[in-house]
Regions:
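Polar, enzyme-active/binding microenvironments
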Residues: 1-266
């Protein structure tokens, strides 16, 4: 990637644009970056860029290492990808800048981990690390996009892995997974962790997405049942949980996104 620091005149800019070497500023909510994980039976570096306006899919800049079982959070400028398992648990994170499709190093996690989850707002991403040292953990990290700093966040109420998370600009709802119904409500201001209304069934290998009002949780693998179609609707106002419309097929280990500001459900 060329160095764009310093002063550029209009002719130089137009020459760079013509050569596809000038970064294009993307409006918030225009693209989603997908890390594919396992491809053809092996961990991959492959990422796709999905453009919402015309439902087009293109190659995105690859990850720094082949990986799977990671997590990601971001804002309208960058996405922070915790790579997860790169052959073993990893603390590596990548910073994907949407303008220019640039992949760079992000500040590492506090511990090597995988099977985590993440949610955040425009300022911070809260990463539940999942499996650390071969066991489910309560560890969470707070990643501040401005300055790319990583510090400890308030721990979960119980050890967990394979959960999911979604939220709005104020709180993140973390379904802890590990075949339990427990959910936590993480308030970004003050870094406060509290009990949230439980899921309708004990489950793990989940996914979640939402907007400023509700989050939809696909429960994934329900304890004693297996892969499921079950979804819950969590309403932030009142902290209520209700049944949501089921998925089209039994599934587990999926993923989800929604069309708020890129990377943030606002």
């Amino acid at each position: 990637m060329p160095n764009y620091s310093g002063s550029w005149n209009l002719v130089q800019q137009m020459q760079a644009v013509a050569a596809s070497n000038w970064p294009v500023v993307l409006a918030p909510g225009t693209v989603g970056i997908f890390a594919l994980g396992v491809v053809s039976g092996a961990a991959s570096t492959t990422r796709n860029k999905y453009r919402f306006s015309d439902c087009s899919n293109a190659s995105a800049t690859a990850a720094s290492a082949a990986s799977y079982l990671g997590s990601a959070a971001g804002n309208s400028t960058v996405g922070i990808f915790a790579l997860g398992n790169t052959g073993s648990a990893s603390s590596t994170r990548d910073k994907y800048t949407y303008s220019g499709c640039v992949n760079g190093s992000a500040t590492a996690a506090s511990a090597a981990s995988y099977l985590g989850s993440a949610a955040g707002n425009s300022i911070v991403g809260i990463f539940a690390l999942g499996i650390v040292s071969s066991a489910a953990s309560t560890t969470r990290d707070k990643y501040t996009y401005s300055g790319c700093t990583n510090v400890s966040a308030t721990a979960a109420s119980a050890t967990s892995c394979g959960g999911s998370a979604a939220g709005n600009s104020t709180v993140g709802i973390f379904a802890l997974g590990s075949a339990g119904t427990t959910r936590n409500k993480y308030t970004y201001s003050g870094c406060i962790n509290a009990v949230a209304t439980n899921a309708s069934s004990a489950s793990y290998y989940q996914s979640a997405a939402g907007n400023s009002t509700v989050s939809i949780f696909a429960l994934g693998y329900i304890n004693g049942v297996g892969a499921s179609t079950t979804r819950d609707k969590y309403t932030f106002s009142g902290d209520t949980n209700a049944t949501a419309t089921s998925s089209s097929a039994n599934s587990l280990g999926g993923s989800a996104a929604s069309n708020g500001t890129t990377g943030v459900n606002v």
